[in-house]
Amino acid sequence: MKFIKYSLYLILAFITFFYSSCSSDEEITQGDADEELVESSKSFLNGEIVLSTKATLSGVDKTLLPEGCPTKFNFKWSDKDSQKFTISLLDFTVGNMGMIINYKCEVTCMVLNSWEQKEYKGDGWIKFKGENGSCWGTEQDGSSFDGDGTNGSVVNGSSIQGYYNAKTHQIQFIVNYNMMNVRSECFLQTIDKSRLATFDADKAKYEADLAAYKKEHGII
């Protein structure tokens, strides 16, 4: 009986410690990112940048090709808050997705929590996160849409969360539009500024390769 009672005390103590640690870790990750890393990021993570992305519609991969789709993003830092910047994605569509999406969201730089530090190893990492961005565009039937229809173009529940290394220029983030089950994933990659000059040609090649892939696999 004493053994059972002692075991229960140990379990209770462990649970208390676990939740206390998680709470403390969550408080830490809400803190500002290192100022030097942020300042270093501003000179590179700025303006138009082409990244490879995956897009899903209702959980179905519309990108299909393993290398992803070349996608142009715009990064603009706030002149009011040194820890904030806005990520914009304009006129985004993939193959016969039919839908054209525009999205922008202000994100805040943060430190990584202990779990994230184990996944994103090495110096230079900052986390960025933002919610309730603006989304507008054209649906598959050609009709336009503007956010949730009740609050301008703001989509409550939409979000961006990602990670950037100010030293290696690696980046990874996910855009959740919270509309029609559409998501964009920028998988872990190193930014190459030279891709901007070849964007149109690369996008055309992607579309041609996508059409060939669909024909080969009998995808309509």
Positions of predicted regions on the chain:
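Bacterial N-terminal signal peptides that target proteins for export
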Residues: 1-8
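Hydrophobic alpha-helical targeting segments used for export or membrane insertion
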Residues: 8-16
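C-terminal motif of bacterial Sec signal peptides marking the signal peptidase cleavage site
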Residues: 18-21
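Acidic/polar, low-complexity intrinsically disordered N-terminal segments immediately downstream
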Residues: 23-116, 120-125, 182-220
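Beta-sheet ligand-binding and adhesion/scaffold domains
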Residues: 122-220
